Amino acid sequence: MKRRRLIFLITCFGLILPLSLPAWAEGLEGLKDLLYDKYEIDAYGFLEARSGLRLRDDPYEKDASINEIRLQTDLSRDFEWVELKIKFDLLGDLVSEEVDADLRDLNLSFSPLDIMDVKVGRQILTWGTGDLLFVADSFPKDWVSFFVGRDTEYLKAPSDAARMSLFFDFFNLDLVYIPKFNGSVYIDGSRLSYWNPMLGRIAGRDDVFHDHKPDDYGTDSEYALRLTKNIEGTELALYGYYGFWQTPEGVDPLIPVLIYPELSIFSASIRDALWGGIGHLEFGYYDSRDDRSGDNPNIRNSEFRFLAGFERELSQDFTGGIQYYLEYMQDYEKYERHLPEGINKKDEYRHVLTLRLTKLLMNQNLTLSFFTYYSPSDADGYMRPNVNYKINDKWTVEIGGNIFFGSDDHTFFGQFKENTNAYASLRFSY
């Protein structure tokens, strides 16, 4: 009965909201024109209704995976010597039953020298060569948004940072300073169920994780750099990071509470034309500084990571891409020896394969896409089918899914099986 009532409410929500969107749309267009004509402020954004439902019964979470109204506003003003950018979302979330504001950008950009660009404030940071796989990219992610069916834009979470880019004849250099650790939005049970190793079962809202996040300015800072060089079309890069694991990869057994151990990353990448497409390689060493000996079972070991990928156009308006990803745990014998009894053991090598297929139809207004992860070592995977149709320059409709599968409940993707969901959205862009 509860499920039927929820389906009825979601259906009503999906039918009634589109009727009110045209009135909202007209008002947003008028506001956009006013801001530019009177204040020379460029305004963009969208108004979106997005709704989704779990396809499996999950006793630990609500049946609705997503049910929200989102208004994004992107404002920018050029003051000749500096540009001000503000991007924020107003969100009415019927799953969490909250109204929230999400500030995604609030920064100043300027160029004090011909060879220097500076951006200070809240911003989205990203680098590396992977397609939804990350080795060099050590910046915050929002895994909850990714798994419940929000736009892929929301996988990248903002950082409060200062970024300086220097452009030399021989190479380019990016320096990033984050005065206080930001961290990723991880699966804690409040929205998505997960494998709880302490309970030895799937848990959710009945046992939400709690963490202790480093939050002292200056003391709990993050530092990152990237050095890039283009040699006749071949893109080379070296990366460095000094900070913390972006998700809580440790536990304080005395409290107990999840913690963010200290981490350094040293990585490199190459991207070049290959076999009529684009190929890329990425290597990384994750130095888990709080457990360099590898004998502390409460902190994730150091590891090597490797990523190789290739993408190309298979036919007109049809592209494909494949990737291979590897995690190799260092000091595996020590990890096995000190692992507490009853805790499921990780593999020394974790392999992941990905496939992306994208087809454009109807004058490229209809996009059919399919992205899947599969781990042969974990025997689990995750599929992301999506259909996006651009009705006109203003209106877009989208349907998609997040499909998890796996042989065991304790593997990375396998633990999310009960979170499998389908969603639909209607968006007006202004």
Where are the regions that the model predicts?
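Transmembrane beta-strand segments of Gram-negative outer membrane beta-barrel proteins
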Residues: 32-55, 77, 82-86, 368
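Transmembrane beta-barrel strands of outer-membrane/channel proteins
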Residues: 45-53, 86-90, 120-122, 175-179, ...
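Hydrophobic, lipid-facing positions within transmembrane beta-strands of outer-membrane proteins
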Residues: 67-73, 103-106, 158-162, 221-225, ...
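Outer membrane beta-barrel
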Residues: 76-193, 232, 406
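Detector for outer-membrane/organellar transmembrane beta-barrel domains
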Residues: 78-80, 243, 271-293, 297-373
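Repeated loop/turn-to-beta-strand initiation elements of outer-membrane beta-barrel proteins
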Residues: 80-86, 116-118, 170-173, 233-236, ...
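Outer-membrane beta-barrel "beta-signal"
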Residues: 357, 403, 416-430
